[in-house]
UniProtKB/Swiss-Prot annotation:
Residues 49-284 are annotated as: Crucial for activation of GJA1. Belongs to the nuclear hormone receptor family. NR1 subfamily. Coiled coil: none annotated. Ubiquitinated, leading to its proteasomal degradation. Ubiquitinated by SIAH2; leading to its proteasomal degradation. Ubiquitinated by the SCF(FBXW7) complex when phosphorylated by CDK1 leading to its proteasomal degradation. Rapidly ubiquitinated in response to inflammatory triggers and sumoylation is a prerequisite to its ubiquitination. Sumoylated by UBE2I, desumoylated by SENP1, and sumoylation is a prerequisite to its ubiquitination. Residues 244-261 have a biased composition (Pro residues). It comes from Homo sapiens. This is Nuclear receptor subfamily 1 group D member 1. It comes from the Eukaryota. Residues 129-205 bind DNA. PROSITE patterns: NR_LBD, NUCLEAR_REC_DBD_1, NUCLEAR_REC_DBD_2. Its main location: nucleus.
Length: 614
């Protein structure tokens, strides 16, 4: 990012088009690109976007006190900015400065919508008109992964179908894209489409279901109510006292930001994180690559690194400090805390907390986990970060890696089990709702590993504690999905669970998991096809976690700066490993909108079961 306005409210949620007032000046998203693009599609690997959009509802819970504090300029009856130069300039700042992750809406009013547009093509949510994320015009629907108007939808479709190479921008690729001038610079318009999340791959997830639209409306109303309460009480979020880690037992504490999460155990984040420290010197690209790769290797420990020992040798090795052996394991369960077998969700939660050690003091949590005896615990971490008893590890013959695994070919012992604490099967007597609760809670044991990995990202601890918590709440599921991808056998359409039982996509789909698992398989296939190295996977995981357009950020400028650093390091590493595959970095970035969609689908599915249970 080259420039950034201190008033830039990245990730704003809802903006109402009113009849008076003005919008603060904002930095346009296009100014966040590099200046070395040559206009071709492949050159986007050098001028990549610095932040990426969430799912359609990914930013609905942002701090609304910011987005409601400014009102855009008035519009004339035909929907264009008023004739005054000040209004025109302010309108340009509003539409172009709206962040990619925001959901732009306007109250339905005859003076806000151009009379030339058919009302049947207007996307509404109970009287609120959604705006195009690219140009700010009235959105006609959910196209290519974002709300967009017919003009931008057709422009993006032509661009990708015909592989058009647009002329180089004459204004340093810093054009503002609004409705009245969107056709002036096609290169900047296409970049804007990509930066807000438009993707050919996103179309396969279909249009927004009715249930999701209803949830979006409910979250909008909740955001408005929260904004009114905050503005009336004159109590900004920044006045919250900073929580420092204490060496005592961890007790429950309220989350510092009103950002709901489907995962369990997020209330412990403030105690596990460190207060913001003074800014450290910006590390070099090589330092970022080495530090992130080391943290990823040591914290997200893979089966072929430390889970290849037999049960007998495991305890002995830990006692003696010698490296673990690589003999196959038996499959009986020895010493693993029993999983709950009743229908009590609280019991399941306590079982997970027991495995995680969430009630332990933060001081007992090691700063790093070297592969070997440093981690004194019965449960080890597999390739998805989930705790696993050593007796549940299966040492596969050399070279027998799961199909489409990014680590295929360079690992000796591969864990062939999906790390679910409680695997779903119809004979257990559990309802579909309880199975889905277990499915979501199975990700909980990896939360601590994600937190520890984040603390070792260079510059992450320089962020405010509020922003650290916000990033972790919003990005943990996506991080786990990246690491979970290798456990899907895309070729056979199966998943191997902890019981060593293979479940097909058809079997799991019969229990109501079809849509989400199909999307997971699809994402896993696309990610694994890139054959990322361990270093690339670690840096990509860091980029997924550090996204400046998350909801409720306090200091988005600092997050964007950190994200820029990680993106530069990832791009340098990808081009270094495969210099001839210039489009590989772009393909990798296009997985970010897919992750947002998966995150949204998981949240919606979990929410729907909870609503049905009430």
């Amino acid at each position: 990012m080259t420039t950034l306005d201190s008033n830039n409210n990245t990730g704003g949620v809802i903006t109402y088009i009113g009849s008076s007032g003005s919008s603060p000046s904002r930095t346009s998203p296009e100014s966040l690109y590099s200046d070395n693009s040559n206009g071709s599609f492949q050159s986007l690997t050098q001028g990549c976007p610095t932040y990426f959009p969430p799912s359609p509802t990914g930013s609905l819970t942002q701090d609304p006190a910011r987005s409601f504090g400014s009102i855009p300029p008035s519009l004339s009856d035909d929907g264009s900015p008023s004739s005054s130069s000040s209004s025109s300039s302010s309108s340009s700042s509003f539409y172009n400065g709206s962040p990619p992750g925001s959901l732009q809406v306007a109250m339905e009013d005859s003076s806000r919508v151009s009379p030339s547009k058919s009302t049947s093509n207007i996307t509404k949510l109970n009287g609120m008109v959604l705006l195009c994320k690219v140009c700010g015009d009235v959105a006609s629907g959910f196209h290519y992964g974002v709300h967009a108007c017919e003009g931008c939808k057709g422009f993006f479709r032509r661009s990708i179908q015909q592989n058009i190479q647009y002329k180089r921008c004459l204004k340093n690729e810093n054009c503002s894209i609004v409705r009245i001038n969107r056709n002036r610079c096609q290169q900047c318009r296409f970049k804007k489409c990509l930066s807000v999340g438009m993707s050919r791959d996103a179309v396969r997830f279909g249009r927004i279901p009715k249930r999701e639209k209803q949830r979006m409306l409910a979250e909008m109303q909740s955001a408005m109510n929260l904004a009114n309460n905050q503005l009336s009480s004159q109590c900004p979020l920044e006045t919250s006292p900073t929580q420092h880690p204490t060496p005592g037992p961890m007790g429950p504490s309220p989350p510092p930001a009103p950002v709901p999460s489907p995962l369990v155990g997020f209330s412990q984040f403030p105690q596990q994180l460190t207060p913001p420290r003074s800014p450290s010197p910006e590390p070099t690209v090589e330092d970022v690559i080495s530090q992130v790769a080391r943290a990823h290797r040591e914290i997200f420990t893979y089966a072929h690194d430390k889970l290849g020992s037999s049960p007998g040798n495991f305890n002995a090795n830990h006692a003696s400090g010698s490296p673990p052996a690589t003999t196959p394991h038996r499959w009986e369960n020895q010493g693993c805390p029993p999983a709950p077998n009743d229908n009590n969700t609280l019991a399941a939660q306590r079982h997970n907390e027991a495995l995680n050690g969430l009630r332990q003091a933060p001081s007992s949590y090691p700063p790093t986990w070297p592969p070997g005896p440093a981690h004194h615990s019965c449960h080890q971490s597999n390739s998805n970060g989930h705790r696993l008893c050593p007796t549940h590890v299966y040492a596969a013959p050399e070279g027998k890696a799961p199909a489409n695994s990014p680590r295929q070919g360079n690992s000796k012992n591969v864990l062939l089990a999906c790390p679910m604490n409680m695997y779903p099967h119809g004979r257990s007597g559990r309802t579909v709702q309880e199975i889905w609760e277990d499915f979501s809670m199975s990700f909980t044991p990896a939360v601590r590993e994600v937190v520890e990995f984040a603390k070792h990202i260079p510059g992450f601890r320089d962020l405010s504690q509020h922003d650290q918590v916000t990033l972790l709440k919003a990005g943990t599921f996506e991080v786990l999905m990246v690491r979970f991808a290798s456990l899907f056998n895309v070729k056979d359409q199966t998943v191997m669970f902890l019981s060593r039982t293979t479940y097909s996509l058809q079997e799991l789909g019969a229990m109501g998991m079809g849509d989400l698992l199909s999307a997971m398989f699809d994402f896993s296939e696309k990610l694994n096809s890139l054959a990322l190295t361990e270093e690339e996977l670690g840096l990509f995981t860091a980029v997924v976690l550090v996204s400046a357009d998350r909801s409720g950020m306090e200091n988005s400028a600092s997050v964007e700066q950190l994200q820029e650093t990680l993106l530069r390091a990832l791009r340098a590493l990808v081009l270094k490993n495969r210099p001839l595959e210039t489009s590989r970095f772009t393909k990798l970035l296009l997985k970010l909108p897919d992750l947002r969609t998966l995150n949204n689908m998981h949240s919606e599915k979990l929410l729907s079961f909870r609503v049905d249970a009430q």
